[in-house]
Amino acid sequence: SGWFPDLIVGVARGGLIPAGAIGYAIGVKAMGAINVEFYTDIGQTLEEPIILSPQLDTDSLKGKKVLVVDDVADSGKTLDLVVNLLKETADEVRSAVIYTKPKTIFEPDFSWKKTDQWINFAWSVLPVITADGSFKEGS
């Protein structure tokens, strides 16, 4: 599209790996994260997403173009919350996801594909290798 952000904010946890990958791809080194809890298990959510600590310093976004990155726009509630929060201070906020679901309430600016399927990303379903070399199921 020709638009480039000054800063990329990944939605933790699912958006952190895509945010880093996009940062490398477009040469943006300024990265941030915002920690949001919404999904409690596969197909189970809180009533509304909540922002958890530590919180992003939104005052540092003044005068900036910000790209918010998450893995999926499923219900769209998480992206809606984050984008609207960051719009309070940033000059411009756009959003990017890998997948968009048909029933989302929030249409991201950039999306790779649309699907109505549950998506299992390698970074969220494969066992974690711990410091002692053992495996622990992801969560």
Q: Could you describe each region identified by the protein language model?
A:
Residues 1-139:
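PRPP-associated nucleotide enzymes
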